[in-house]
Amino acid sequence: MEGIKFADVLRSFEKKAEDDEYVSVERDYNERKVIENDVRRTELLGVDKRNRKVIKVLKRLLFVELDKIPIKYTQGMSEIASVFVLYYFQNIVEEEVAKGVLASGSDEESAEESAADGFSEQFIEAPEDENVELKRFVSRHKDTTAILGIVLTNVFRRKLEPLVVDDFKLYKENMRIFVEMMKKKGIRIPELESYKFMGSILTFFLRNLSRMEDVHKVFEIILSCPNTCPFLLLVLFYDKISNGKTIDSIVNNDLFPKVVKLEEEFVETKKRVESRSGFSRMRVMLVGGIASIVAAVVVYKITKKE
C-alpha cells in the first residue's frame, strides 16, 4: 500500500455511515465489569509507565468510550481501542499534564507504585473528583472525542463484529481456510491448536507487536482490506507467533503486496474446501437416499407378506 498511511486510512472511519447508529448505550454491571478488567490489563504501548497521571487519564478515557459505543463488547476490544485512544489523545494528555491543566499524581509515590497503578484503577466507581476532571477534559476536546467514538464504532462494526457474531462463525470458517493454506506449506495445525491464535487475530496482532510504527502498519492493512486479512497476516507471521517471538521491524516490509498475493491463494483454497465439503454433503445425501429406498423396499415386502 505504497503512499497510503495509517492517518489516511483512518479518515474513512471518521465519518458516520448513513444506515448505522452511533447513539450511546447503557450496559449492565457485569458487562461494564468485563470492560473495566480488560482496560486495567491493557498496556498503553509507547507511554512511559512511570507517568502515572497520563496513564490514568488515557485509561479512564478508554473505559468511557468502550462503555458507551453501541457495539456488544468482546474481550480484547480494549487493546484495539487503545491504539486509537493513543493516536488521538496521547499528545494532548501528556501536554496538559505537563502544563498542570490536568493535575499530576502525588510526588510521594514511588516509581513501583506508579507503574503498578494501572492495575488497581477503578473506573465504574471512580472518585467524584476524577469523574469531574474527565468530564472537563472531554468538554475541552469534545470534537476529537466525538471522532474517536465514531472511529471505534466503525472499526468494531466493520472489522471485528463480523468475525465474532453467530458464535464466531466467520472466524471459524476463515481459520479453517488458514489451516488448509498452512497444510499446503507442509505445516499441519490440529484444530484445537489453531484456537491459540485467537488472541492475536482478535487484537489485530497488537499482543505480538512492540513498536507503535509496526502497529500502525498492521492496522492500516487490516482496516483497508477484506476481513480475511488477519488470517493472511497470520500466515506471514506464523513462525514468530507460534514460537512466542515479537513481530518487529515491519514498517519497511512489503506487507501489502504479500497480503494481496495471499488473498488470491485464500480464495482458491476456499473454493477447493467448499467443493470438497459439497462433495461430502452430496455423498451423505446420496447414502441417506439409498438407505431410505432400501428401508422402503423392506417395509413394502413385510407389508405385502402380512
Swiss-Prot record:
Question: Which Gene Ontology CC terms are recorded?
Answer: membrane
Principal location class: membrane
Compartment(s) of residence: Membrane
Keywords (A to Z) from UniProt: Glycoprotein, Membrane, Transmembrane, Transmembrane helix
Q: Where are the transmembrane segments?
A: 218-238, 284-304
| Membrane topology (UniProt) | Multi-pass membrane protein
NAD: present as a keyword of the record? no
Give the positions annotated as glycosylation sites. N208
**Entry-linked InterPro entries:** Rab-GAP-TBC_dom, Rab-GAP_TBC_sf
Q: Tell me the superkingdom of the source.
A: Eukaryota
Q: What is this protein called?
A: Uncharacterized membrane protein ECU10_0880
